[in-house]
Amino acid sequence: MNGKMEEISGFLKIFLENQMKRVATFSPREFQDGLSEVKAVLGAARSAQVTAPPQVVQGIRAQFVRFKVDTPEYWGATSAMINYLSPPVPQGLSKCTSVDKVAVQLYKPDGSTGRILSTDTTRDSGCLLDLDEHKTIVGFGCNRCIIKYSGGQLTLSNVEFTDCIYIFAITSVTPCAGKLLAREILTNRTGDIMIPPVE
């Protein structure tokens, strides 16, 4: 029985890799019309731990970067791609705590009132950061963290994520900071993300 399951698993991986190759060569119209299929293929490929050739993965990434639409289907498929790119998630990480200690300075160089965000960065490591729980993150860095995001309201400024795992579950059109973060992940092959200070 075990041998049969391994054989079925092998066939499934081959099938899913072929589906990923097909998605990588979609025309813009096919990609737009097939977003739910793209999401399903990428979700299944992650679950089955399919390792597609780098040129296939890059071809699918390019589809997302090239195709700029703002629909729930697009962001759901984008979440599936980001999750596919991330390695398996380690269990038992505690929540990041340093993110709550980040300060925002309220002044302008000319003496007028206003909001200038601190350029100092507080760092954390090896923890879980749920972006939806914080809404605004300023001057924060995280190394080898799990970064979760479900598409809620979000403001990011002077933020660095280094060697992190990303878990996205976006089901609707996401705010600007969420879009920026998703695009950075899709275009950056290292997984190191830097969001500059916003004034």
Regions found by a protein language model. Name each.
Residues 76-136:
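N-terminal domain-start segments of secreted/luminal proteins
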Residues 1-97:
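Terminal non-domain segments
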Residues 102, 119-127, 140, 145-152, ...:
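Solvent-exposed loop/turn tips at the surfaces of repeat/solenoid architectures
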Residues 173-199:
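Long terminal segments
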Residues 14, 18, 37, 44, ...:
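Generic detector of low-complexity/intrinsically disordered segments
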